[in-house]
Amino acid sequence: MHKKMIALDLDGTLLNSESKLSDFTIDTIKKISALGHKVIITTGRPYRMAHTYYKQLELDTPMINFNGSLTHLPEKKRGDEQCLTLDKKYLLDMVANRDTIQADFIAGEYRNKFFITDPNEHVADPKLFGIESFQPENQFNPERVTSDPNCILFQTKAEDKYALADEMNRHYDYNLSINTWGGPLNILECNPKNVTKASALTYLLDKLNMDQKDLIAFGDEHNDTDMLALAGHGYAMKNASSVLLPYADSVTDFTNNEDGVARQLIQLFL
């Protein structure tokens, strides 16, 4: 069988609503990998919030984090990894205008650290950042922002997160890629201009000498649109946002709480 690259979003797609992998999904992904297909976790999460799933699935393939800002082979030092950043001025500006965007919190995300405006468990769930509790070193302070972040993450009270993303993209003259993330949570992520899951997957396809038609992708949210459009075959989850549906070739028969990805992969390969 011709080998495929299978790009898998995590939240709302591979993970259930409790942010867990079922045993059925784990077993299925292992079988798919054993056939030689390249399973690529493709997520808005930083690596520290995705590595547990990578290990559970026993993957040895590259991973895409921060919606495309970081493409790397976990635990390995490789010269061909891609780590992209955005100008720190955008982080400082968003913090200065946090009331305008109705932000509960704003965080600057780096490969191995983050700074958050409100390190308070009543405002932000520490687990959203892959930790059990916030520490003093996580507190945002303009003086600490000495380097450019991989992305900016914030939660908003705005009723329509998609409209806010569009408004902010216009405000910053499309010098950023601003997308929604986090399934049902009102979370927006800001990445460097033209950086998306699709741009990272294009980079990987080139590195692995694979064709775009051999890419299969699964997603559920606005930040998966480019990825599904790029793929030879893009699947929107049964539980996907309606925003994603025009970009999908198919919709899975089952939701993320029903092992929708695993069941579709079994139909395709097992």
Give the residues covered by each predicted segment:
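Active-site phosphate-binding/coordination module
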Residues: 21-123
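Short active-site oxyanion
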Residues: 36-40, 59-61, 150-151, 213-214, ...
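Non-catalytic pre-domain segments flanking phosphatase-related domains
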Residues: 1-8, 27-30
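Mg2+-dependent phosphoryl-transfer enzymes with acidic/Ser/Thr/Gly-rich catalytic loops
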Residues: 1-5, 22, 188-270
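Short, structured coil segments at secondary-structure junctions
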Residues: 57-59, 67, 171-172, 230-231, ...
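Short, acidic loop-to-helix structural element flanking the phosphoryl-transfer center
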Residues: 19-36, 83-90, 130, 134, ...
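Conserved acidic, metal-coordinating active-site core of Asp-based
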Residues: 103-105, 109-218, 222
